[in-house]
A protein has these predicted regions:
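N-terminal, motif-rich segments that launch catalysis or mediate targeting to/interaction with membranes
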Residues: 1-86, 104-134
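Alpha-helical and His/Cys-centered functional microenvironments
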Residues: 11, 98, 140
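Short alpha-helix carrying the canonical HExxH Zn2+-binding catalytic motif
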Residues: 85-93
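Short active-site segment of divalent metal-dependent hydrolases/proteases
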Residues: 93, 97, 101
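Conserved small/polar residues in nucleotide/adenosyl-binding loops
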Residues: 135-143
């Protein structure tokens, strides 16, 4: 169900609840956190034609996330890479929100109630209306 705005909003809400040291890390690497919030969806934005970049994003949505996060955290620890950690924190937000919402979205799409992408876009539209786009500043700029 979540798409661009929902993932961004969720990441900002998560950020507010993080301990101060994690907020500081995200402020230092805010762009990477925000990119991570979109997970593999960011690969869908290259829409010149049917292409391997978009296909890779689709495939990532069907893969188990555990191996991705384990390898990412191995790299964080091995290289003391806080920039990668900020990205993984954002990607983790993406994964959590998708995991919570996609069972419902997939059910509605399978039953022919509403196409997957239409439901996601409508959810974003409703969130924008409900928040009146109050969340205009970036999570990394808050505090």
């Amino acid at each position: 169900m979540p798409t661009t705005y929902a993932h961004d909003l969720f990441g900002k809400e998560v950020y507010k609840r993080l301990p101060s040291d994690m907020k500081a890390l995200i402020r230092r690497h805010g762009d990477l956190y925000r990119i991570g919030l979109h997970g593999p969806d960011i690969l869908f934005y290259y829409m010149v034609s049917k292409n391997p970049v978009t296909q890779f994003g689709i495939e990532m949505h069907h893969e188990k996330a555990r191996a991705f996060f384990e390898e990412g955290m191995r790299q964080v620890r091995r290289n003391d890479d806080e920039a990668l950690f900020a990205y993984l924190l954002g990607f983790g937000c993406h994964y959590i929100l998708d995991s919570a919402c996609h069972p419902y979205v997939n059910k509605m799409a399978a039953e022919g109630v509403i196409p997957h992408i239409v439901l996601e876009k409508e959810f974003d539209r409703v969130l924008m209306e409900e928040t009146c786009l109050l969340y205009t500043s970036d999570a990394a700029d808050e505090e």
